UniProtKB/Swiss-Prot annotation:
It catalyses: Release of an N-terminal amino acid, Xaa-|-Yaa-, in which Xaa is preferably Leu, but may be other amino acids including Pro although not Arg or Lys, and Yaa may be Pro. Amino acid amides and methyl esters are also readily hydrolyzed, but rates on arylamides are exceedingly low; Release of an N-terminal amino acid, preferentially leucine, but not glutamic or aspartic acids. Coiled coil: none annotated. Its EC number is 3.4.11.1, 3.4.11.10. GO terms for molecular function: manganese ion binding; metalloaminopeptidase activity. Its cofactor is Mn(2+). Presumably involved in the processing and regular turnover of intracellular proteins. Catalyzes the removal of unsubstituted N-terminal amino acids from various peptides. This is Probable cytosol aminopeptidase.
Amino acid sequence: MTIQPSDKPLLEWAGDSLAIGLFEDAVELTGELATLDQKFSGVLKELIAEEEFKGKANSTIFTRVNPGRPVRKLILVGLGKPDALKLDTLRRAAAAVARVAKKQKSKILGFSFPLWNNDPAASAQAIAEGVELALYQDIRFKSEPEDKGSQIETVDLLGFSGQEAAITLANQIVSGVNLARELVAAPANAVTPITLAETAQAIAKDYGLQVEILEKEDCEKLGMGAFLGVAQASELPPKFIHLTYKPEGTPKKKLAIIGKGVTFDSGGLNIKGAGSGIETMKMDMGGAAATLGAAKAIAQIKPDVEVHFISAVAENMISGRAMHPGDILTASNGKTIEVNNTDAEGRLTLADALVYAEKLGLDAIVDLATLTGANVIALGDDIAGLYTPDDDVASQIEKAAQTSGEKIWRMPMEEKYFEGLKSGIADMKNTGPRPGGAITAALFLKQFVKETPWAHLDIAGPVWTDKENGYNGAGATGYGVRLLVNWVLGIGE
């Protein structure tokens, strides 16, 4: 599929389907749209009246045009209130149009959308992202894939002449999102610690990044007892992934993105029981997937920022070698941890990853993880939790989320709650009381960052959706990739 800007006037464009964005309660056709309606014998006005179209956000209607016309179908999509127009409004509207056009077997699709904030580059990027994200399909594990039907071949963005770079940026970012989607969606017998390490090596080879894969023996030498405690039960070896992107010249900043990479979480000896959703625990490496997806995108975009992509990857399994409830692990910064729940393993892997990252001399660290069910209880399935003691980093992340349209909410870091993590025989326990569980998880991670500005994103909810939601189909969403890329690009401005 080719997405391209077009300087073709609306009244002269020809193709299979033409999509027009209209604001809520402003669907009266005027100016160029009125002329277009006359050209098509009043079919637009008739369609709006018959369907009682009001322009509500993401609502769509379409009609076929009489044979012999330059356009076969007209699609109207609602954009909501004009004063509420956001980039994500355009992204979601474009996704809705793309699905309609594909269902109608359109090969050539045109968009006539208004600008967000008089910014053609950002608007073109959002529309292109919406189309590409919505049309993604994962059929790798189908023995007889369903008929995909007619595919959209060309998308023209009318009125966006000169915005090739914005569309290219959208392509680069979406390539990272789709990599993350593929990794999260794949079962644990397809994506293992070995697989993720190989994926990192492939990204490095394809895009010129530096890569280092630390094996178990390397991690032992670095004293990564927390990470290795999680990994010790599995027959598969742990892999500590470190990808590095370095720009030409002196970087403006040095950043790290750390992703939780538990490729399957059985819960360990505190095994996940019936009704726990254990069959979904292939997605417990969603943070690592987003990290690798961001690496793929950033390697193509080439910002003036040095970025380290890190993940301590392992399975949390059950065997005669498994860590026991009550075991004491020593992390690589010397902190001792009483494991009172083997199913709170992600924070143990992140602990050593954070210590490792801080030694790189960074300006900021962001980790993201499918860390707690408590965050899902607090914020639901669509919103990630943002935990940080640093207001500047919080503002950067929130700004990036506004651009990407990925929902996030800053949560408190109530230091008093750390009392619940205190241990009688070690420096801390790995879990505290049930109330405030997402906060105590973030406070646990905070013990492994000394001075570097740091933020933790709990993405347990939005990493997956059970049904179609905007530009995400049912399944893995690739949450975090676009947010992280926008964070890095914002730092590099």
